């Protein structure tokens, strides 16, 4: 009996030792080499892919390292290649329903993916990636990533066509949440092509950090405490946009994916630069909207919100220097777009010399051009000469003698509905030189065949040396601009423009009455000149006071058009020249089918 019990005890102890040693055998190098070969063979037999592993090492309790791994597709294209993959897990936490990942690290890793029809190609070449002390709570469906780093990355995405953002009707969002302590990026380059819409979209980031983030996959929301991008370089080259492919139709069992909610408490960009360039564009002097290059971009946005088409961007600071030399030093304001419409509130932009402030609000019907959409615009600006010639350098010669800080002042107010807009005021002035004021109304602005409107204006020119400075030398010595007042009004209908304008200087008056049929290209009018002092404008010539009247009419605008017809009948009641007064002069001129005739 004692021997039987002894044998039973030996068997039980042997089984126990065997059960304990079998799991530990996976830490034996020979067993690991055998397991490496078995894994490679199984992947080949089950997927048709080819897996090659240089070295596999597993250390207690669970620290796995795989060196020189290569995974090839059945067509022998590289899907994954890495010099080193390290994974460290605490197995004891599994008993509590948690996966505690002590470390995941990738070194010199290449990933390439191409779908079956080659409309999508994604590749990522990662120098170093690591995450430490991560935790996966299997009971609460929560993932915690306290610290993640990506150093050196080359990411490329090529799309031949875009697919609609849809999900299966039977699918449901995953009930998982992810919390992020810090994500650090350095030396990352991203490139995207989606021809013909996008020729190339390129982004290089020297350093970026994301702090305290929360991702709710079920609620489809992302919340970030702070995002910082330092020394980013962004380049966008749009394509031709001529895609003749037929648009894809959604399958009957798909629905549009609900929008994600993205909230960023603090967004900061420091020392960034950006380029927008049309294909084959040769940059022009000044501000070229086909070639925009911004440098030293500084952005500060607090409480950024986006959910589908809803967006709120409270701009705390925006500064940059454009290639033309325009340097924006300060920008503030809040842009919002939601179901009620769009608005730009408390917007202010400054350069060293200029400033612009604006308040803009429009109802959501602005997107569908609904005539009942309410619209309100308030705009005030001071545009300095120094900034204007940077934007339009071709006018530099016309600003001689003007201080660069001299500024055009404007104050514009509009309100009403899209189908019935009122121009409350449009005041534009150059202090000491001119003042212009206008009011008006326009109806059916978005419908060219139904448009109607009216405009009233007044322009006062002052006796300023500015006019002589902006004229060429050959004219500045001959022409003088005395105090002059321009007034007028115009009425616009779908086919007709009617206008009345007057010019007053001294005791003289010029009145213009005109009509233009825009559809038939027909026009007629009268010009009445009453004692107008030509000598005030041409002081070095021999002309004096002029009184005259002119009638004109015609059809077509181009004199080279064989169907053009025009007549001009000028009657001079009196004109002073070289101290003599001439009266009773008349001049007639006619252009008919390319033939000109006239008489005095």
What is each model feature region?
Residues 1-48:
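N-terminal type II signal-anchor transmembrane helix
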Residues 46, 75-88, 117-131, 144-145, ...:
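Amphipathic hydrophobic-ligand
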Residues 55-160, 171-240, 253-274, 295-316, ...:
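Flexible beta-edge/linker motif
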Residues 111-114, 195, 532-536, 573-577:
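Sequence/structural signature of outer-membrane beta-barrel proteins
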Residues 151, 230, 318, 349-350, ...:
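Outer-membrane beta-barrel pore domains and translocons
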Residues 157-159, 236-238, 356, 388-392, ...:
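Outer-membrane beta-barrel proteins
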Residues 225, 375-377, 453, 499, ...:
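Transmembrane beta-strands of outer-membrane beta-barrel proteins
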Residues 314-318, 341-348, 421-428, 495-503, ...:
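Transmembrane beta-strand segments that form the barrel wall of outer-membrane beta-barrel proteins
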């Amino acid at each position: 009996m004692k021997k039987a019990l002894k044998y039973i005890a030996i068997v039980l102890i042997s089984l126990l030792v065997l059960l304990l040693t079998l799991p530990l055998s996976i830490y034996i190098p020979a067993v690991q080499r055998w397991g490496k070969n078995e894994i490679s063979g199984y992947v080949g037999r089950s997927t048709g892919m080819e897996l090659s592993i240089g070295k596999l090492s597993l250390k207690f309790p669970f620290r796995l390292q795989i060196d020189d791994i290569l995974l090839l597709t059945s067509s022998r294209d590289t899907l994954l290649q890495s010099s080193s993959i390290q994974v460290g897990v605490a197995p004891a936490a599994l008993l509590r329903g948690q996966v505690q990942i002590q470390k995941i690290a990738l070194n010199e890793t290449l990933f390439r993916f191409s779908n079956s029809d080659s409309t999508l190609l994604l590749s990522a070449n990662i120098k170093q990636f690591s995450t430490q002390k991560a935790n996966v709570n299997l009971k609460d469906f929560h993932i915690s990533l306290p610290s993640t780093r990506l150093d050196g990355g080359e990411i490329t995405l090529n799309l031949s066509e875009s697919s609609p953002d849809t999900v299966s009707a039977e699918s449901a969002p995953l009930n998982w949440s992810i919390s992020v302590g810090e994500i650090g990026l350095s030396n990352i380059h991203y490139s995207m092509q989606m021809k013909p819409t996008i020729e190339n979209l390129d982004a290089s980031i020297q350093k970026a950090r994301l702090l305290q983030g929360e991702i709710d996959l079920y609620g489809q929301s992302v919340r970030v405490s702070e995002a910082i991008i330092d020394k980013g370089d962004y380049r966008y080259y749009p394509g031709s946009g001529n895609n003749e492919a037929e648009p894809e139709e959604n399958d009957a069992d798909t629905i549009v994916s609900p929008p994600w909610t993205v909230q960023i408490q603090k967004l900061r960009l420091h020392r960034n630069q950006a380029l927008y360039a049309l294909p084959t564009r040769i940059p022009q002097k000044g501000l070229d909207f086909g070639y925009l290059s911004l440098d030293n971009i500084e952005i500060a946005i607090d409480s950024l919100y986006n959910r589908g088409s809803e967006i709120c961007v409270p701009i705390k600071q925006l500064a940059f220097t454009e290639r033309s030399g325009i340097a924006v030093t300060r920008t503030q304001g809040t842009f919002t777009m939601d179901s009620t419409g769009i608005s730009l509130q408390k917007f202010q932009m400054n350069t060293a010399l200029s400033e612009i402030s604006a308040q803009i609000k429009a109802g959501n019907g602005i997107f569908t051009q609904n005539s009942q959409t309410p619209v309100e615009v308030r705009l005030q600006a001071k545009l300095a000469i120094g900034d204007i010639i940077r934007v339009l350098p071709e006018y530099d010669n016309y600003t001689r003698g003007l201080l660069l800080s001299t500024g055009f002042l404007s104050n514009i107010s509009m309100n009403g509905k899209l189908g019935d807009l009122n121009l409350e005021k449009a005041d534009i002035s150059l202090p000491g030189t001119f003042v212009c004021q206008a009011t008006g109304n326009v109806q059916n602005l978005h419908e060219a065949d139904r448009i109607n409107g009216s405009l009233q204006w007044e322009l006062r020119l002052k006796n300023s040396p500015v006019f002589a400075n902006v004229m060429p030398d050959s004219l500045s010595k001959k022409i003088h601009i005395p105090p002059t007042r321009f007034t007028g009004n115009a009425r616009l209908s779908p086919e007709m423009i009617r206008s009345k304008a007057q010019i007053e200087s001294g005791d003289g008056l010029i009145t213009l009455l005109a009509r233009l049929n825009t559809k038939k290209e027909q026009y007629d009018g009268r010009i009445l000149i009453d004692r107008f002092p030509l000598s005030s404008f041409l002081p070095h010539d021999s002309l004096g006071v002029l009184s005259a009247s002119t009638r004109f009419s015609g059809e077509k605008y181009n004199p080279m058009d064989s169907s053009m017809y025009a007549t001009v009948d000028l009657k001079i009641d009196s004109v002073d020249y070289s101290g003599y007064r001439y009266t009773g002069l008349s001049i007639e001129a006619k252009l008919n089918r390319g033939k000109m005739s006239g008489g005095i």
